[in-house]
């Protein structure tokens, strides 16, 4: 299915929050894509790095508001904000600042000879 309404798609409660695994439903496998729905005060810890996997990650806030920490940098992100963590060794985390915060998380390890996505835009 190439279309998902996140507000109607079920979440799965984990030790790391309420997640929506999106790869299988969307039929994509070249990168990881999931969404998390979270509220302030939830006991979730998203602090991690990707040293073991080499992944680059990007986060897109689609609802609510969140604070991201990427290395030593802090970002206040509202809907439409994209935050990236291209350095696998950088510690990254986020926390919701408003109820109903929803973040799409995308990650993949770079491959040698990978195309420069977006170059066609100019």
Regions flagged by a language model, labelled:
Residues 51-68:
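Short, conserved beta-strand element in jelly-roll/cupin
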Residues 65-67, 74, 91, 100:
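Structural motif
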Residues 1-49, 119-122:
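A short, N-terminal "cap"/entry segment at the start of jelly-roll beta-barrel domains
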């Amino acid at each position: 299915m190439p279309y998902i309404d996140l507000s109607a798609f079920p979440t799965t409660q984990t030790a790391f929050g309420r997640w929506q695994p999106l790869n299988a439903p969307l039929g994509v496998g070249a990168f990881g894509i999931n969404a998390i729905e979270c509220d302030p005060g939830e006991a979730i810890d998203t602090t991690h790095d990707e040293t073991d996997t080499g992944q680059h990650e990007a986060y897109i806030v689609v609802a609510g508001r969140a604070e991201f920490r990427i290395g030593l940098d802090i970002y206040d992100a509202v809907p439409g904000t994209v935050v990236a963590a291209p350095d696998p060794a950088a510690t990254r985390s986020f926390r919701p600042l408003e109820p109903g915060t929803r973040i799409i998380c995308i990650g993949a390890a770079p491959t040698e000879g990978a195309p420069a996505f977006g170059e066609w835009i100019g």
